[in-house]
């Protein structure tokens, strides 16, 4: 099976078919972070200073003081491309599986539209997974992992602690041994007042790796605090600590050189992923068949960046050599 007619997607199709379904709305909420899409370049996050003393005795004239200062943090953007290729035989088996899993497709009449939808779904899955991996585990220096297209959140956590020691995020160089419940407890109790005060807004979240997530799951199960029939989907329950959601960050088989276990408490609005598909001259998403190599090929070019808005709103633990959970 080959892509007989190459397909180049226009701007609206790029947004509506590839990026918005994977990184906007419910999808962004599930990721637990803030996503900015197609913001003007350079991409900046406005940070307004706060004035908690707004009320004044009434008199004529203006008593509001000077205008509030506007601070902006720029998100460094990098241009990336994602490419994949399949032999005609492999491409057929992959696409055919996607098609047959759809109840709306008549296998006796596979139209071009059905095939195109399947091709789009295949590429979108791969693209979303690759962006997710780079967003969390990327390191341009290549020290954390072999994913080096951009510097992701985990590497930025460690760099922020190195730059500002007063951040209540502890980076442990040696292997630790402690109960999993103590990890969450200390992340909360050690958090500064500014971070704890944000709990009332409902946006605090714990980001943990799969190993800590599983250990906490089994810990709650041993206490009889998890209803395995009603609180999870496919064996993955929705966990929380004192009402704060716990989001699992799987490495998807990626081997990390350090930061092998982590538990980070922050506000979900504090971690920003910026995506831009409009302001790069080489922007494109296309699919085509290469007759010389007999391959179906797919490519996307876009801009991406990840940033921590306020490193002081971080708390928790990063274990470079892992943690022995008891």
Predicted regions and their residues:
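Short coil/turn segments at secondary-structure boundaries
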Residues: 96, 135-141, 200-209
């Amino acid at each position: 099976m080959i892509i007989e007619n190459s397909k180049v997607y226009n701007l609206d199709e790029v947004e509506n078919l590839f990026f918005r379904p994977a990184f906007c709305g419910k999808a962004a909420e599930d990721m637990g972070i803030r996503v900015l899409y197609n913001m003007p370049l350079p991409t900046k996050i406005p940070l307004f200073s706060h004035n908690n003393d707004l009320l004044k005795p009434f008199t004529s004239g203006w008593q509001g003081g000077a205008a509030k200062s506007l601070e902006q943090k720029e998100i460094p953007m990098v241009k990336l491309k994602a490419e994949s290729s399949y032999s005609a035989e492999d491409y057929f088996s992959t696409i055919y599986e996607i098609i047959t899993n759809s109840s709306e497709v008549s296998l006796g009449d596979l139209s071009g539209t059905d095939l195109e939808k399947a091709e789009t779904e295949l590429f979108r899955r791969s693209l979303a997974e690759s962006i997710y991996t780079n967003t969390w585990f990327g390191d341009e220096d290549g020290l954390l992992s072999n994913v080096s297209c951009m510097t992701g959140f985990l590497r930025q956590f460690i760099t922020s602690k190195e730059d500002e020691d007063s951040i209540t995020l502890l980076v442990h160089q040696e292997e630790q041994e402690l109960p999993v419940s103590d990890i969450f407890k200390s992340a909360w109790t050690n958090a500064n007042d500014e971070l704890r005060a944000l709990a009332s807004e409902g946006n605090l979240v714990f980001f943990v790796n799969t190993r800590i997530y599983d250990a906490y799951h089994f810990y709650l199960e041993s206490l009889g605090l998890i209803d395995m029939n009603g609180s999870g989907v496919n064996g993955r329950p929705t966990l929380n600590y004192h009402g704060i959601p716990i989001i699992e960050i799987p490495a998807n088989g990626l081997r990390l050189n350090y930061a092998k276990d982590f538990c980070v408490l922050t506000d979900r609005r504090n971690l920003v992923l910026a995506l831009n598909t409009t302001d790069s001259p080489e922007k494109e998403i296309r699919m085509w068949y290469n007759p010389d190599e007999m391959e179906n090929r797919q490519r996307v070019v876009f801009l991406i960046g990840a940033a921590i808005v306020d490193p002081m709103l971080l708390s928790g633990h990063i274990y470079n050599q892992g943690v022995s959970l008891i």
